[in-house]
Amino acid sequence: RADAAPTVSIFPPSSEQLTSGGASVVCFLNNFYPKDINVKWKIDGSERQNGVLNSWTDQDSKDSTYSMSSTLTLTKDEYERHNSYTCEATHKTSTSPIVKSFNRNEC
């Protein structure tokens, strides 16, 4: 099949989760091909590697693309110490990364 660029979306922690003292930021990367993809997290512009869990779904039976999620897990205190959260996906379909981000103070 032809190469396909991922559709990338980012989600801040839910208010319910923050109430319980945790904070997970999730980045979804959907319907890309081939499977090789690189995901980078940045907090206030600095790359973050701790606390990241990547999970792939099985290859889609209809269109043979791949999807994955990348979850950045923090404590509520740590989450609230920073403002800018960014997920960067690097895939062969684009020379520059696909970047999705949000600012905590705008959620």
UniProtKB/Swiss-Prot annotation:
In this chain the Ig-like domain maps to 6-103
Q: Which InterPro entries match?
A: Ig-like_dom, Ig-like_dom_sf, Ig-like_fold, Ig/MHC_CS, Ig_C1-set, Immune_Resp_Modulators
Keywords, sorted A to Z: Disulfide bond, Immunoglobulin domain
Record-annotated disulphide pairs: 27-87
Which GO terms of the cellular component aspect does the record hold? extracellular region; plasma membrane
What Pfam families does the record tag this protein with?
C1-set
Gene Ontology BP annotations: B cell differentiation
Q: Which domain of life is it from?
A: Eukaryota
Entry's PANTHER family?
A: TAPASIN
By what name is this protein known?
Answer: Immunoglobulin kappa constant
